[in-house]
Amino acid sequence: TIGAERRARLRTMTETPVAAFVCPSRRAVQAFPFRRDGSLVNADNPDVCGRSDYAANIGDAVPVDQRAAGPKTWEEGLAWDDGSLPEAAWVAARHSGVMFQLSRVAPRHITDGLSKTYLLGEKFLPPEEYESGYSFGDDQALYVGFDRDQSRSTHRLHPPLRDRTAPRVWLKDRDDETVLDWNFGSTHHQSLGMASCDGSVRRVGYDVDPVVHERLGNRADGQIVQPE
């Protein structure tokens, strides 16, 4: 059981922005409105929170919405990745990237090569949502874990984009090119920053071939491509 003192301390952590996770070209290092009241499991819910302008690579799978903090019982834990539990759809999808819900990816699993597989990168965010907290991809805290706030896809429906005005489209049990809060992207004019699993960082143009971008998100599809 999480005690009251620890919940309060975790709230303080949630409220605290971290400069390393903020793109200075996009927004200031400050706390922004927390729009998911009641959603935190192990901490008291704050009014404001620190956010991240960077996201993990979940791979090239089609995004599937999920709403679970994790298995609540031993039985659920045993069935968590077999597809029988709707709330565990993300795990059952067996993502091809390196960081996702309950991921345990080691370097030996990245058979396409560490330098040819994305680790993380800048995330797309509409300019009108930089401070609002109303974007579905930027409404929670830096420390929330697996969520579109911290996780993005390289599926060809979701090419990297320069920040632009976009509608708020809620991903339910479908996915299409209008759901932009799974895209990587940035505020920069011609390219975004992507880090590979070997620690190298490169600029990737918004005009990158969608198939190349997609394959760089998959750690083990055998379709090895050279990052542009």
Indicate residue ranges for each PLM-predicted region.
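Surface-exposed loop/linker segments characteristic of extracytoplasmic
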Residues: 1-228
